[in-house]
Design a protein with these regions (language model features):
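Switch II (G3) loop of P-loop NTPases
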Residues: 141
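A short alpha-helical cap/connector motif
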Residues: 1-137
Length: 141
């Protein structure tokens, strides 16, 4: 398990590896697909961080989550997998092409039905949310 680019100590890295779940074929494919994008691939949430997000979402029993900055959907897949069975995730992605890539990856991962992707500036999407909308988990990427 890498501790780059965000340094974490070995004890935390071991804990995440042991408790947060591994990387299946879909996640490995998204990692490869994103790496092929060149220098912008650094925008992908690191696998260890994404696994930790999934664990946090699962442990909190979150029903409704938000992600600002979806990129290729890697973090969104992990967040959606951690949600309660009838939970939902709303993702905000500025770039329409990246949103389409994320949608395909979410669908392939089997969590597409839980995820809405809003294309455009996140501030506009957030302002459009109903006032009474409760959010249990938010990830600003």
């Amino acid at each position: 398990m890498s501790t780059d680019p965000t340094p974490i100590n070995a004890e935390l890295a071991d804990y995440v590896r042991d408790h947060a779940g591994g990387r299946d074929q879909v996640l490995l494919k998204v990692e490869e697909q994103t790496a092929a994008m060149g220098s912008i691939s650094i925008m992908q949430t690191a696998p260890e961080q994404a696994a930790f997000l999934e664990m946090l979402v699962r442990l909190t029993g979150a029903m409704r989550a938000l992600e600002i900055g979806t990129f290729t959907g890697y973090g969104a897949i992990r967040i959606a997998r951690g949600l309660a069975p009838d939970g939902s995730l709303t993702c905000f992605e500025l770039d329409g092409e990246r949103a389409a890539v994320a949608r395909a990856n979410l669908d392939e991962a089997g969590v597409g039905e839980k995820v809405e992707i809003v294309v455009g500036p996140a501030i506009e999407g957030l302002r459009a949310l109903p006032d009474e909308a409760a959010v249990d988990f938010a990830y600003l990427d």
